[in-house]
Amino acid sequence: MDRRVCGVDEAGRGPLAGGVYAAAVILDPARPVEGLADSKKLSAARREALAPLIRERALAWCVAWATVEEIDRLNILHATMLAMCRAVDGLAVPPDAIEVDGNRVPPFVLDIPARAIVKGDATVAAISAASILAKTARDAECLELDARYPGYGFAAHKGYPTAAHVAAIERLGVLPVHRRSFGPVKRCLALGQQALEF
C-alpha cells in the first residue's frame, strides 16, 4: 500500500485582518489532480477551479484556522502552527508522514514523522494542494469581511497592508477583525482610530 503523505501549508500570515488558515491534504495517487502549483503562482480563477477537485479527489483534507484573537495572544508564528496542527488533527484518514511548507515543523500531537520543505508548495503536490485550499478559504473570509465592512476594500487587498487598506483604517478606524498586534493597526489604535461597533 502507498504511504499516505499529508501536505500542509498556510495562508494569511501577512495580512492585518482576519484569521490565519492552514490546510492538510492527503492526495490519492489513483485520482491525480492536474495543474497543482503554489497557490501564489495561480490566478484566483484557477485556484477556485482546482479547490473542489482537490476536495473531491483527495483521500482526506481539512482546512482549519486560528482566530484574530489567537494571533494577537500567541503571535502570528505560533497561531500559524496552531492552525496547521488543527488541520492535521482534522483529517478523517491518519497520515503516515507529514510534509510542511517552510522551514519549521509544528508540534503535531500525532506521533508521525514530519519534515519541513522550503518552497514545498512549488515542488510537492500535496503541499501545493494544501496551499490552494488554505488560500481559497482565506479569500472566502475576505469576501465575507468585504460584505460586512464596506469601505475597507477587503475584496481587493485581502487584508494585506496595502496603502489603500492602511488609509481605510486611518479614515474609518480599527475593526474587531483587525490584528491589534500588527504594527499599522497598533499605530492606528495609539492614535485613537477605533471603529464604531459593527
From Swiss-Prot:
<comment type="similarity">
    <text>Belongs to the RNase HII family.</text>
</comment>
<feature type="binding site">
    <location>
        <position position="101"/>
    </location>
    <ligand>
        <name>a divalent metal cation</name>
    </ligand>
</feature>
<protein>
    <recommendedName>
        <fullName>Ribonuclease HII</fullName>
        <ecNumber>3.1.26.4</ecNumber>
    </recommendedName>
</protein>
<feature type="domain" description="RNase H type-2">
    <location>
        <begin position="3"/>
        <end position="194"/>
    </location>
</feature>
<dbReference type="InterPro" id="IPR012337">
    <property type="entry name" value="RNaseH-like_sf"/>
</dbReference>
<keyword id="KW-0255">Endonuclease</keyword>
<dbReference type="InterPro" id="IPR036397">
    <property type="entry name" value="RNaseH_sf"/>
</dbReference>
<dbReference type="GO" id="GO:0006298">
    <property type="term" value="P:mismatch repair"/>
</dbReference>
<dbReference type="GO" id="GO:0003723">
    <property type="term" value="F:RNA binding"/>
</dbReference>
<keyword id="KW-0479">Metal-binding</keyword>
<keyword id="KW-0963">Cytoplasm</keyword>
<dbReference type="GO" id="GO:0032299">
    <property type="term" value="C:ribonuclease H2 complex"/>
</dbReference>
<comment type="function">
    <text>Endonuclease that specifically degrades the RNA of RNA-DNA hybrids.</text>
</comment>
<feature type="binding site">
    <location>
        <position position="9"/>
    </location>
    <ligand>
        <name>a divalent metal cation</name>
    </ligand>
</feature>
<keyword id="KW-0540">Nuclease</keyword>
<dbReference type="GO" id="GO:0030145">
    <property type="term" value="F:manganese ion binding"/>
</dbReference>
<keyword id="KW-0378">Hydrolase</keyword>
<dbReference type="Pfam" id="PF01351">
    <property type="entry name" value="RNase_HII"/>
</dbReference>
<dbReference type="GO" id="GO:0005737">
    <property type="term" value="C:cytoplasm"/>
</dbReference>
<keyword id="KW-0464">Manganese</keyword>
<dbReference type="GO" id="GO:0004523">
    <property type="term" value="F:RNA-DNA hybrid ribonuclease activity"/>
</dbReference>
<dbReference type="InterPro" id="IPR001352">
    <property type="entry name" value="RNase_HII/HIII"/>
</dbReference>
<dbReference type="InterPro" id="IPR024567">
    <property type="entry name" value="RNase_HII/HIII_dom"/>
</dbReference>
<dbReference type="InterPro" id="IPR022898">
    <property type="entry name" value="RNase_HII"/>
</dbReference>
<dbReference type="GO" id="GO:0043137">
    <property type="term" value="P:DNA replication, removal of RNA primer"/>
</dbReference>
<feature type="binding site">
    <location>
        <position position="10"/>
    </location>
    <ligand>
        <name>a divalent metal cation</name>
    </ligand>
</feature>
